[in-house]
Amino acid sequence: MPERYGPRVIEHLVNPRNAGEVGGPSGVGEAGNAACGDQVRFTLRVGGDLRLQEVRYRAYGCAACIAAGSALAELAEGRSITGAAQISRGDIQEALGGPLPPGKEHGATLALDALHRAFEDYWSRQGDALLGGEGLGDGSGGRRGVVAAMSGGVDSAVTALLLKERGYEVVAVTFRLHDGEPGSRSCCSPDTVLFARETAHGLGIPHFTLNLRELFDRRVMRDFVGSYAAGRTPNPCVACNAHVKFHAAAFLADRLGLRHVATGHYARVGEGPCLERPEDGRKDQTYVLWPVPPRLLGRTIFPLGDYRKSEVRRIAEERGLAVARTPESQDICFIPDGDYRSFVRRRVRSEPGEIVDRQGRVLGRHAGVVDFTVGQRRGLGISAPTPLYVTEVRPRSRQVVVGSRRELEVRRMLVRGANWFLDPREAALVQVRYNGEPVPCELEEGAGGWEVALLEPVFGVAPGQSAVFYTRDGAKVVGGGIIARRDA
């Protein structure tokens, strides 16, 4: 045995702990690849009290992987699932007598990743409860704890830090939403999951990953593609908040007996509950939070609502967080290169068609309606003496209608699928774009949804986008919905 390994490593190699397989396991996880030389596999049995009754491992490859698997299995068995989820790479190396030799540190990383994949498998076996979002409680009977969504960025890291400093029992969770690109650090990509786990362990809190690929594909990605094919302009963040992120965090909180959920959004929760704008108006994210069900909003904490972004970064720097200077992601999380047209085209067939004006005169040709959205000016492929904008997309006839900016003017719209926090009669302002200015409005409920009269014209309103209503002072969100139709 090479002398560079310490006596505890050698002890685990000569006398491995918990080697083998759990029969009928609650969860199974693997990391690495035997074809590449190193692989670790964990199987575990979780009791009704969420304690790890049995933990077994198998490891193939270098001595560091085998010893790390043995040490981790011994550390994890008998702990609560949250206690085991708090074990860090440093804890494994300490159990092995100190840092592993240079070039062998990956042994602890692989072992830890295999265990966490077993946790992930355990939660996935909850199946219907996790994917359906049904039967979620209001958290009233839970402990003073919180499941904090952690994306790998500075906002979610500081969120978890602030909650811990306020005395909450904090459990971090990262959502595996899509496969992503190798090396990508977009929100919830594979590499981000590992980075978020390192950040959580650095804060001394447990970390779990929930595999939500199926749910995210069904409720967000397919809707995204289908909307463009139907001539609408979707907002995937709204769909995720409506059907995925908050439901999944509440699912985990319920299973762990914790009262609250938290995210790094810049918003506040007021009495009612109602959604309120944050301290930092430039970072206001209430526009994408309107679909959160009131029963979930009532148990949600937004710690960053009382801070400005500059203060959040300063807190991260003062506490020595590695994410302090992480750049913000401006792209759709599952399209990190920003090329949504290529993404949609890979998933739906789009036929060529005509570009016409409002009178039906043909001005040019296009390669597919999925390339266009209302308000678009660039990429039309036609020349004109004055600027032209997309004013309508007609998927059935495969026509893209263009016109002057004035033809984008909208004074009425129909909103469907509304979610209300306050009495709709309190709605005095409406915002139709993420960074748009709210304008005065009047609402009237009809058989097909909410008819909205805009007291000031708005340009470029796109079906499929959100209409979010605010109180007269603009401070509180009354509710929101999806724009189904717009009229001049």
UniProtKB/Swiss-Prot annotation:
Region (Interaction with tRNA): 283-285, 433-434
UniProt-annotated binding residues for ATP: 149-156, 175, 264
Residues annotated as catalytic: 240, 333
GO molecular function annotation: ATP binding; iron ion binding; iron-sulfur cluster binding; tRNA binding; tRNA-uridine 2-sulfurtransferase activity
Region (NifU-like protein): 1-130
Cysteine pairs bridged by disulfides in the record: 240-333
EC number annotated for this UniProt entry: 2.8.1.13
Main localization category: cytoplasm
GO-annotated biological processes: iron-sulfur cluster assembly; tRNA wobble position uridine thiolation
Subcellular compartments: Cytoplasm
GO cellular component, one term: cytoplasm
Keywords per UniProt: ATP-binding, Cytoplasm, Disulfide bond, Multifunctional enzyme, Nucleotide-binding, RNA-binding, Transferase, tRNA processing, tRNA-binding
Signal peptide (from-to): none
Catalysed reactions, as listed in the record: S-sulfanyl-L-cysteinyl-[protein] + uridine(34) in tRNA + AH2 + ATP = 2-thiouridine(34) in tRNA + L-cysteinyl-[protein] + A + AMP + diphosphate + H(+)
Region (tRNA-specific 2-thiouridylase MnmA): 143-488
Site residues by UniProt (Interaction with tRNA): 265, 465
Function: May be involved in the formation or repair of [Fe-S] clusters present in iron-sulfur proteins.
Similarity comment: family membership: In the N-terminal section; belongs to the NifU family.
NCBIfam families with a match to the protein in the record: PRK00143.1, trmU
Protein name per its UniProtKB record: Bifunctional protein NifU/MnmA
Protein's organism: Rubrobacter xylanophilus (strain DSM 9941 / JCM 11954 / NBRC 16129 / PRD-1)
